[in-house]
Amino acid sequence: MSGHNNSELFVLCSSSQLFLQPLWDHLKTWETLILSPFFPVFFSITTYLGFCLPFVVLDVLCPWVPALRRYKIHPDFSPSVWQLLPCLGLTLYQHVVFVFPMTLLHWAASPVLLPPEAPELLQLVRHIVLCLLLFDTEFFIWHVLHHKVPWLYRTFHKMHHQNSSSFALATQYMSVGELLSLGVFDMVNIMLLRCHPLTVLIFHVINIWLSVEDHSGYDFPWSAHRLVPFGWYGGVTHHDLHHSQFNCNFAPYFTHWDKILGTLRSAHAK
């Protein structure tokens, strides 16, 4: 009976691996680009700006399309070009001047080889969930410390709070110290779990999307916090309240740490 169960489990794992293999085989045709030292920065910037662009378009249209305002957390606010351009400029500058040298050092110290086989689907999902939970925990601790210690707040985190009403391009409007800290959290978690390169790519896409959505200022019916049950995920309304009140909702994504420490505040309780 045990052998029969083990055989079924082996077939299930093999099938889930085959499910991802065509995608991985296709990505491997771009192996030279993926293994290039330029790829991490190129991938990060293009993914980030690609996710920001729809919200920028919505912000431009919002004054002319009143129906869009029903989805805005702050219906009367739309970022001006003088708010958007500094955010875009800072993101590009920091990625070129600071992030690229760091990724170059990591590329030289830890060369990556693309394995021939894709990860099992269950393993990929498990690692992505663990990466998100670890990042959420690390940033929660970092975030609370930077709000409780005035010097840390002034030196590293104050810049991110210059825009009290969030918008997508303000997601990475932060000091270089904060940006690099978030990058280190990502890198450590991926190395700790020994994630497959495909898992790493998908995790980064999900993480960038969730962070942009958190700052977008739009609460849609399909927003992440409406899709995750039981109030486990805070989402855009949760994080927007942090930007307006400062002393609550420190976790970027999930709600458990704020619940445990008594810093969770509902957007409905404003």
Swiss-Prot record:
Motif range (Histidine box-3): 238-244
One Pfam family in the UniProt entry: FA_hydroxylase
Motif Histidine box-2 positions after renumbering to this chain: 157-161
GO CC annotation terms, alphabetical: endoplasmic reticulum membrane
Reported cofactor(s): Fe cation
Transmembrane segments: 38-58, 81-103, 127-147, 167-187, 190-210
Membrane topology: Multi-pass membrane protein
Catalytic activity, EC: 1.14.99.38
Protein name, entry field: Cholesterol 25-hydroxylase
Species of the source: Sus scrofa
